[in-house]
């Protein structure tokens, strides 16, 4: 792999790491508030709707939308087991 490509990948990974830290902080805030049920497949549709609402607002909602997308990804993966 050439140096430019490696540099680009390193930059992307650094941004993902920073974003993941914000995601974790927000998930912690929500857990402290008492939010539960994220891993319950029965909540899939509700979480999907919430994600679409956060994504449509976009500005300032990126972390929440990403967390909801992560939860949907997890639920889908669990259903494939």
Give the residues covered by each predicted segment.
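Flexible "arm" and connector segments at domain edges
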Residues: 1-81
